[in-house]
A protein has these predicted regions:
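Alpha-helical scaffold segments in soluble metabolic enzymes
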Residues: 31, 38, 82, 156, ...
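C-terminal lid/capping helical subdomain adjacent to the catalytic/cofactor pocket in oxidative enzymes
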Residues: 184, 189-237
């Protein structure tokens, strides 16, 4: 068997020979961030109090600082709607919440990501341990984590693998979701110097670099050679 630790609960499966996964996505993002700063990029973490304009140039204000830009990109994932609402653009962005648990020290029970399609969850060996993920709910940004969904993940994992202890940590992630399952990539309909890149659902990490390249080309008035109309915010006008 490819995965000898799995219980014999299945009749068969599908293997994706060329599928890949990252055992620690955060490490990759840190390396990308380091490269960004080495090339002159600057990072500031601030609470944004206001977004307005000075002769069509976007202006961001915190409690103590004011920044004016030639062009501004809103790429805040599920939190992007807080800014698009301020720009009077009615974008139906929803928060699709997915749940995760870790079993630290049990990552060697499987050698690759495994999805149990009938139960709607999956398991992945990570540096932090065996990660079990699944379930989807439209729960907004403020509602608390659902303990029943965590319990279901743990029970489902134990249906597949023997000897799992109590899990070490649990959390949920926010996926920015739009009704047509396409992201928004392109300029604001109301303000020509504001651009959007959000709404990538479950594929933000996968498509982030591609979207960044597209937005960079648009801001620089370069030809992308792509039909971006399906990704325009105008589709929700």
């Amino acid at each position: 068997d490819l995965e000898p630790n799995l219980k014999p609960f299945y009749d068969g499966g599908v293997i994706y020979d060329y599928a890949r996964h990252a055992r620690n996505p955060k490490k990759i993002l840190i390396k990308l961030f380091e490269n960004f700063t080495l090339k002159g990029g600057k990072f500031l973490k601030l609470n944004i109090e206001k977004l307005d304009f000075d002769e069509e140039k976007p202006v961001i204000r915190s409690e103590t600082q004011r920044f004016i830009f030639d062009k501004l990109v809103i790429a805040c994932g599920a939190f992007s709607k807080k800014f698009t609402d301020k720009l009077h653009e009615n974008i139906p962005l929803e928060t699709e919440r997915g749940y995760h648990v870790h079993f630290k020290g049990y990552e060697n029970l499987i050698s690759r990501p495994i999805v149990y399609a009938d139960k709607g969850f999956g398991m992945t060996p990570m540096e932090q341990g065996l990660r079990v993920v699944g379930t989807v709910e439209f729960g907004g940004l403020e509602n608390p984590l659902s303990k029943s969904r965590i319990s279901n993940l743990v029970l489902n994992a134990r249906e597949m693998l023997d000897g799992l202890p109590e899990h070490n940590d649990e959390w949920l992630g926010f996926r920015p979701t739009l009704p047509d399952f396409l992201p928004i990539i392109g300029p604001s309909k109301n303000f020509k110097n504001v651009f959007y890149s959000f709404g990538h659902h479950h594929l933000g990490w996968t498509l982030g670099a591609i979207s960044g390249k597209i937005i960079s080309s648009m801001i620089s008035d370069e030809n992308t050679n792509l039909d971006l109309e399906p990704y325009s915010s105008l589709r929700f006008s």
